[in-house]
């Protein structure tokens, strides 16, 4: 019995110390292709911050259209798209309706709101319709501006409450 136990312990010790060598290969790949970069933004968490559409400061009533243009968070200029490759690249930009879906700025201290619109041209004739893609084309290696202009209609009626009015658009 002692011989059997000794033999079992020797075999068990041998099995524990036995190592098997396994070799193989892993393929490693990279494909670099035509791509585009968006300029004029900063990243905050996992969200790009493209800039601010700042209509400035006014009294509770105003007679003229208030206008603004998005100033890039990174450069102070327009958002831009630059693509590499040899062919022109089409891309689209859509802008949502903001936090209340109707493009209104809300007073941070009351329920008062001010309606606004956003456009892709300085004349404010080409409206960014809510969630409707606008097409742009970029030429190889050249930055294509993605302008965002804003307008607020005159308010000659009931004065708006004093305070800050804010909204956030997703582009």
Name what the model sees in each region:
Residues 4-12:
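Sec-dependent N-terminal signal peptides
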Residues 14-20:
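Sec/Tat signal peptide C-region and signal peptidase I cleavage site
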Residues 20-108, 138-171:
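N-terminal small/polar-rich segments of proteins
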Residues 123-132:
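Short beta-strand and strand-turn-strand segments in soluble, beta-rich domains
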